Amino acid sequence: MSLHRLSVAAAAALLSATALSASTLAQSFNDKKPISYSVDGATATGYFKVVAETINSIVREAYPGSDATYKPGSPAGGILNISNGKSEFTFTGGGPEIEFALEGKAPFKESLKGKFSFMMMMHDELVVHALMTKEFSDRAGVRSYDDIVAKKPAMRLGVNTTGNLQSTYGMYLLHFGAYGIGDAELAKWGVTLFRGNTNEGLSQMRDGKIDMLVNGAFLPTAEVIDINRGRPLVWVEGNEQRMKSAVGKYGYKVVKLEKGGYPFVERDTFMTVNWNAGLVGNHVSEETVYKFLKAITDAKDKVQKVHPSLAKFSKEAIVRNPTSLPLHPGALRFYREAGVMK
């Protein structure tokens, strides 16, 4: 046999072996062998615990014997823990947390770039509620952010805790930041900040302890409707162009809130909508991520029933990556094989 024919034969054999190896590798993930992971980054009770535990049960059913656990924490803490190998996944990744983690800004002590990756979009449905008591609105003569910035009324403003970056930098600081206004300027007006999670803020509004609340909730939220019955509310109207200029850095949406979205929304206005991402530590194996995504997308009907925010859950929806993070290799392989990305 000539040297040329030997080279061709060798190349063909190598290609065949490579294809066989790739095929064998791909098939090795389509089994029932258990996987092990922990989910970090959310509170001990509430929405994300319910979501995580439901997803974990789906994974255990798909891969009997899997060790899928839930660890209460915080969004920033979740990113830190998946980056240092203490946990595998977090479902509460937000734009500000990711930004601060990559840049090494407090509460992160160093950049975590290269230590965690994007896995999936959890949802794109968290509405930033800008609520004000009607009594204060009438007294101060303000109904919109434009009005507030123009008149600068002293008020009691309910916002989230400093440790929750996505619900501060991604909410009230984002809205006021569209006008170049931060905490220092608000303080000069005589604005007093009352900090707490959404439920605490709603309780303060119900009790008349705050005049305005800017925090995240899904639409509609039953407690907001209930508060309005005893303490009439107004929705603080947003300026579409200013909001769009502010949300771009995080890939958030500005959408129309139609008249009647809540009983007290008297005309169409605009609101910002935030997403949460499923993130994964780079120490996690390709197999674990691939099998995790396969299990939950195969059972998408179950996931969609967990909460209205997940009603659109599908492999086509969760592949959207609004961050600067790379896809984890296991996620990249899954989405390619699922036909939702090239």
Locate predicted features.
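Bacterial N-terminal signal peptides
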Residues: 9-21
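A structural signal for short loop-to-beta-strand junctions that line the ligand-binding cleft
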Residues: 109-129, 261-270
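Bilobed "Venus flytrap"/periplasmic-binding protein-like clamshell domains
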Residues: 34-62, 66-72, 128-207, 301-304, ...
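Pocket-flanking alpha-helical
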Residues: 53-58, 69-112, 199-205, 213, ...
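An extracytoplasmic/periplasmic, membrane-proximal ligand-sensing/linker region
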Residues: 199, 207-208, 212, 217-230, ...
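Bacterial N-terminal signal peptides that target proteins for export
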Residues: 1-11
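Periplasmic solute-binding protein
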Residues: 122-138, 271-279
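C-terminal lobe and pocket-closing loops
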Residues: 234-291, 326-327, 334, 338
